[in-house]
Amino acid sequence: MSEKFDVVVIGAGPGGYVAAIKSAKLGMKTAVIEERKVGGTCLNRGCIPAKAMIHASTLYREIKEADRFGISASDVTYDFEKILEYKEQTTGQLVQGVEQLLQANGVTRYYGKGTLFEGKKVKITGNEEQFVEAENVILASGSKPLILPIRGMDLPRVLTSDELFKLSEVPKSLVIIGGGVISVEFATVYSALGSKVTILEAMPRLVPNMDKEIAQNLKLILKKRGVESHTSAAVQGVHMEGDTCVCTFVEKEKEQTVEAEYVLCAVGRCPNTDGLFAEGAAPDMERGRVLVNDKFESSIPGVYAIGDLIFGAQLAHAASAQGIVVAEQLAGKEPSVNLDVVPGCVYTDPEIASAGITEDAAKEQGIKVKTGKFIMSANGKSLITKEERGFIKIVADEETDVILGAQMMCARATDMIGEFVTAIANKMTVAQLLKGMRAHPTYNEGIGEALEEAEGGAIHVVPKKKK
């Protein structure tokens, strides 16, 4: 006799485990099925380990540059084995924390692979096979690295992000195919640790989904740190010459090659649906993704999908928010999270963050806008820490004063973007957001200055000469 649950979640990544815990908190009998460590890609092979390595590598670079603060540090070195240990300890601690939260909230944890059968039955394939039944099933099996369909992608020195994390030594040189978030973050890490990094991006600019000015600044900053970037570069393939990877690409109609010890394929991710559906049990899908309605319900009543399995933002925090909303809906409650405003963050140095729409996007939609921009070189905290390169820009509706978007490239941008997410989600105006006093000296003062600039003039900005 199979056990019955109100909610069965397949996958315990940031979408799945959050959906499971929220469902349990709302009084539903809940189970979660996961064949690997809880936390999914984000916790084990993505966000957290990457940011740990960014922190370590940035700290190494800052110590080498400490002379500008009057600090002498000669013969500074790093121990990559210990950096990897620190990364593993960090992820391990968080994984253990998630396991404890599942247990503390009464979520039944099944170890194994979950496969959906007809009638909302789920087979768990682990040490032994068993079935569970569910009133509602939430599919949250996440994604896996996307591999380009070009020659050489199966070579042993051509890696995905999963495999790059497993390297025990820093590559002497690294070619990164793709110029998105994953690419520029790994470029930040390995260039700081001494690798010669080259980025090949097919689009006209790096981080193409971000503001154009941010992309231009990022390319210059990476170049200053020794990272070579080629945009509008179509990669043709990779071959080996001895132990060296040779990557062929076309840029401005000219075929070129670049050599490296390793090649990283970082062109995005695709849904992980391997073994997820038994024959005849799959819902309607398109290009490998589950099609859902505005309540995240698939074509099969009572079967929901969230996160990287569906179209939309492929981000850990988006998946978590969707998991919360689905659980709330199943409990008959109104959603507590506005899913329309998704912050985007890039953990380069300086950090990049955005929310809402850009000025160009607003104009394309026919919206008359006003903008406010503050250059962080005039911010006291930025000068103290010598992180003065960057800016904060806000976009607001010219007629209603409602904030539509914000783009930031500065220290702690990823920590500060939440203020704008809250403002945009609640349709706050520039005037309303200016009501709050900001502490001094903080990076956050830059937000106030950008808002003031949109209203007619920031205090710490030289006014434009009247014509």
Task: Cite the ranges covered by each PLM segment.
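Beta1/beta-strand and adjacent pyrophosphate-binding region of the FAD-binding site
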Residues: 2-13, 170-180
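FAD-site-proximal beta/loop scaffold in flavoenzymes
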Residues: 154-171, 257-331
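Flexible, glycine-rich terminal cap/loop adjacent to redox cofactors
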Residues: 8-15, 19, 24-36, 41, ...
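N-terminal Rossmann-fold NAD(P) dinucleotide-binding loop
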Residues: 16, 183-184
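Short hydrophobic core segments
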Residues: 8-10, 114, 132-142, 177, ...
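Gly/Ala-rich phosphate-binding loop of Rossmann-like dinucleotide-binding domains
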Residues: 20, 24, 187, 191-192
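Glycine-rich flavin
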Residues: 2-5, 21-28, 33-170, 198, ...
